[in-house]
Curated annotation (Swiss-Prot):
Full protein name: NADPH-dependent 7-cyano-7-deazaguanine reductase
One GO term (biological process): tRNA modification
Binding site for substrate: 62-64, 81-82
Source superkingdom: Bacteria
Function: Catalyzes the NADPH-dependent reduction of 7-cyano-7-deazaguanine (preQ0) to 7-aminomethyl-7-deazaguanine (preQ1).
Pathway linked to the protein: tRNA modification; tRNA-queuosine biosynthesis
Annotated organism of origin: Campylobacter jejuni (strain RM1221)
GO MF annotation list: preQ1 synthase activity
Length: 127
């Protein structure tokens, strides 16, 4: 097993590395993860997406290697677009307890269908 495969396989989301946020100002962190992959729970075919993470930290920030490894754990999981983005959102919201957070999954088209899933802490039902 190669070292990257080993790191992904052994990654434990319960021990995701987070750091204290020492900044006194409010600010937004924007992270783009352009190589997200999961497998369709129906067909098993791979689905690819770019994940856009934005959050206003409170007391914690996520360490960048930790978010990379966490995202890579989805690589061989059979999970829907909706479930994967909601899981990422809930995990980061629970771990970081940010003042505000948004996670967007912009999935590559498959079968002429383009899906974008967005979860955000200030979600309002559209009228």
């Amino acid at each position: 097993m190669r070292y990257g495969e080993k790191e992904i396989k052994e990654f434990d989301v319960e021990n995701m590395e987070i750091w204290p946020n020492d900044a006194k100002n409010d600010y937004i962190i924007k992270i783009t993860l352009p190589e997200f992959m999961c497998c369709c729970p129906r067909s098993g075919y791979p689905d690819f997406a770019t994940i856009y993470l934005e959050y206003m930290p409170n007391k914690f920030v996520v360490e960048l290697k930790a978010i990379k490894l966490y995202i890579n754990t989805f690589m061989y999981r059979n999970v829907s677009h909706e479930a994967s983005i909601n899981e990422i959102y809930n995990t980061l919201k629970d771990k970081l307890k940010p003042k505000w957070i948004k996670v967007v999954g912009d999935f590559n088209p498959r079968g002429n269908v383009h899906t974008v899933i967005e979860c955000r802490s200030d979600m309002v039902v559209p009228k």
